[in-house]
Amino acid sequence: MGAEEMAIAALGFIAADPALLPRFLAITGIEAQAIRNAAREPGFLAGVLQFIVAHEPTLIAFAENAGVAPAAVLKAMRALPQGDDSYDASA
């Protein structure tokens, strides 16, 4: 699973959880109706994974749900742009 695909899966995981979604919206300041457009931006997707990895129980739950190791989530997060020019869309 590529970095963007993992971030989109994480976004779905967040959206499906009635406790996580309000927390995500509050922390990011994004409105629910704006998520679809924002999800087209690799920087937003990096933020989704940052949200997941910032809370270990959420990271573990997502990794189990996605069938990946928690380290793979961290690797995907690092592969997405985070305000630098080193982003490689093919990673």
Where in the sequence are the language-model features?
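Metal- and O2-centered redox machinery and metal/ROS homeostasis
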Residues: 1-91
